[in-house]
Regions:
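Short, flexible helix-loop junctions that flank or precede catalytic/ligand sites
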Residues: 1-381
Length: 381
């Protein structure tokens, strides 16, 4: 019977799990294809076993921090098995843990079934690129694919700032330094400020969590660097509103201008179940910062139109909404109609589209296409 955390992690990898959940008094649980499944053949975890497993993965400094704060993020590696992102916490007076399996191989955007425009985004030399979504939506995997493509195609100096380091990048054409918060640096904002003095071409910030980090990331993008980061937001519109809302109202007009000048793309994703039940596939919203969308960022009254602009920017810019992505996945028979309808923002219009019937959104999209084309022509004058 598995008795150590390494044994349980081996079970997780063998079962192609994304996560291992451990709780005192319960069997271990694995999340496989988005569903939690108990390992009923493994004895329920005792408080002593849980504490022993947690502390076996920690350094002395991490043990001290956990005793002080009752929660800890860290990375853990098992030779010959892989790397894992670990969150340790207290619940009802006992230790609990969730361990995320980090794939050993960095998959390409094609292998991840991401839209072709992702590779175009990878060609950006400067500005801000954001990957957003809920926890477990594959943000880190997509960012790793983007960094790996830059690494393979450009002779850049890439600095990553992560908490903790997940994917390990080896130098290809690029030269990569990976820094871990609380191991190699105090925090995201400190490391980001330092990175600006380290001759970077591209900087990955694991997460933009606070005003100082967001402000420094915008400055880095504004001064000619490519900055990649994540936010826990559902789509492009919410992402833009979240960034602006972090700042005090007197500063928000300037932040809108700064964001409009630096933002290149927002990639928002959700994982949906495959039709063949062999895992999940990302449904992806892609926003490219065109002249019209930059105007929507600057003008608070037009920010709500970003979703419509994305829907209208498919053919010319490679943008797509979640529903357009779901339709594409359904058309390729990668997901079922039931899964598509369950995930669609507007299930009724999705049904009409499947039947080839025009809907109100089709007319709105065509009108938006005309508005965007007129705006782009005016902006070029």
């Amino acid at each position: 019977m598995p008795t150590s955390v390494d044994d349980l992690l081996r079970r997780a990898v063998e079962n192609k799990s994304s996560d291992l959940h451990l709780k005192v008094g319960n069997h271990p649980y694995l999340r496989v294809d988005g569903l939690l499944t108990p390992l009923t053949d493994v004895p329920r975890v005792t408080p002593e076993e849980m504490l022993s497993m947690a502390f076996s993965m920690m350094t002395n400094r991490q043990k001290q921090k956990f005793k002080e704060t009752a929660e800890l993020d860290m990375a853990y590696g098992v030779a010959g098995l892989g790397r894992f992102r670990v969150n340790v916490f207290q619940q009802r007076g006992n230790v609990g843990m969730v361990l995320r399996v980090i794939p050993t191989k960095i998959r390409t955007s094609e292998e991840l079934n991401l839209p072709p425009v992702i590779n175009k985004i990878c060609e950006e030399q400067r500005g801000l690129v954001l990957v957003t979504g809920t926890t477990g939506s594959g943000k880190s995997t997509t960012l790793a694919a983007i960094i790996d493509r830059v690494n393979a195609t450009r002779a850049d100096h890439i600095i990553t700032i992560e908490d903790p380091i997940e994917f390990l990048h080896r130098d290809k054409k690029s030269f990569i330094n990976q820094r871990e918060v609380e191991v190699d640096t105090a925090n995201f904002s400190t490391a980001l400020r330092a990175a600006l003095r380290q001759d970077p071409d591209a900087i990955l910030v694991g997460e933009m969590r606070d005003l100082e980090t967001i402000s420094t990331a915008l400055l880095a993008a504004e001064t000619g660097h490519l900055v990649l980061s994540t936010l826990h937001t559902l789509d492009a519109t919410e992402t833009i509103q979240r960034i602006i809302a972090v700042f005090p109202p007197p500063e928000q007009k300037q932040i809108r201008l700064q964001l409009a000048a630096t933002l290149k793309a927002v990639v928002s994703q959700r994982l949906v179940r495959r039709a063949d039940d062999k895992g999940r596939v990302p449904a992806v919203e892609i926003m490219i910062a065109t002249a019209y969308i930059r105007d929507c960022i600057i003008n608070p009254d037009k920010t709500r139109l970003i979703h419509d602009a994305i829907a209208a920017g498919t053919s010319q810019y490679g943008m797509q909404t979640f529903d357009q992505s779901l339709f594409d996945l359904y058309s390729k028979q990668l997901i079922t109609i039931d899964e598509a309808l369950a995930r669609a923002s507007n299930a009724d219009e999705f049904k009409l589209r499947i039947q080839g019937i025009r809907s109100a959104s089709d007319a709105a999209r065509e009108e938006m296409e005309r508005q965007m084309a007129d705006f782009e022509r005016f902006a070029r004058r």
